Amino acid sequence: MLGRLMPREGKFFDLFNAHAARIVEGSRELSAMIGAFSELDAHAQRIDAIERAADKITHECITLLHKTFITPFDRDQIHQLITRMDDILDLIQDVAESVALYDLRRVTPEAKQLAEICQMCCERVRIVVGLLTNVRQADSILKTCGEIDRLESDADRVMRSALSKLFREESDLKQVMKLRVIYDLLETITDRCEDVANIVEGIVLENS
């Protein structure tokens, strides 16, 4: 059924793909920001611009949803998908603002690793969203969703290790609190990527 309905309203997939491209762009900018730990304000401003562009795409998608009689799949799934995708960029923006404003003395290897995992998750979000136009690629979609799930688990493990190390080695309570917020936001990005993967899995399994 999904294959028969998709050609009637391809605009949704254009919007999903455009938003996913912004997600990857934002994640790369964030990874570069944390990796180099320099020009923080400039990185944060670029991420703000990316997030604003993504917000416009989200608004356009929701407006289209209200105006379209035949949708490529369930309306609630469309709304959930674009909303969760937008959540990813909102969190990327939150991390960038926190890093720029918190006056951190340093960025830890664990924060860099989490940012890299976030970028890998976001790149796979773009892949699964791009594959949604063809349900015959269900195996590839589900495989990539599984990769997102594994990356989210990796982020959980890195965060637990990072917090343990932070509490053992950092004597400045303010720095502990600031880094903990950064870690939590980064890990939550991977949670939202996993949410997207779960939504996509549901779409594929229900319509293939």
Where are the regions that the model predicts?
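Cytosolic, long alpha-helical scaffolding segments
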Residues: 1-208
